[in-house]
Amino acid sequence: MIGILNRWRQFGRRYFWPHLLLGMVAASLGVPLNLSGVPDHAALANTSSSQSRQNHGTTNFNSLALLHDIHRRLSFSVDYWQQHALRTVIRHLSFALAPQAAYARVQEVAETERVAPSKIQQLALLDTLNALLTHEFKPPAIIRYTEQVERPVLSPYKPGLWLAQVQGIRAGPANLS
């Protein structure tokens, strides 16, 4: 009976819990903003008068690009427990992919003669996992206001000018101004 429990505990530690944890993290990263517990500001708008709703809609429409960026950033934020779960999964993967000391001693002679491509890929994956574990996430810089380029005002369509430009016919004024 004890042997069965020990094997079940080992199975859970090696296979069940890391996969369950990875599935929970993957599922929670795809949760939209409203389901993650953050209140939706559009749903909390003041409904007492139609004028306030129109003003709220106007301000939202005027800064639509900024609000879109804010909404996108908030929906993909990762809280502390998600970070902890991701680091745990990455740590499990790095231990699972790390070469064993005994295996390295036995295969040391064979590795000096030739390095298998799968071994190179495994080491590259380990480097990537290590970088993911030690990398501190910094959100991208937000550029709030940019100068708009002044474009020349185009004159309204005039058939005489079009004929002069396209057909080469002198049917309009000598110059535009």
UniProtKB/Swiss-Prot annotation:
This is Secretion monitor. It holds the Pfam family SecM. InterPro entries: SecM. Keywords: Cytoplasm, Periplasm, Signal. One of its GO terms (molecular function) is translation regulator activity. Belongs to the SecM family. The keyword Cytoplasm applies. Regulates secA expression by translational coupling of the secM secA operon. Translational pausing at a specific Pro residue 5 residues before the end of the protein may allow disruption of a mRNA repressor helix that normally suppresses secA translation initiation. Residues 1-37 form the signal peptide. The gene is secM. The keyword Lyase does not apply. It is found in: Cytoplasm, Cytosol; Periplasm. GO terms for cellular component: cytosol; periplasmic space.
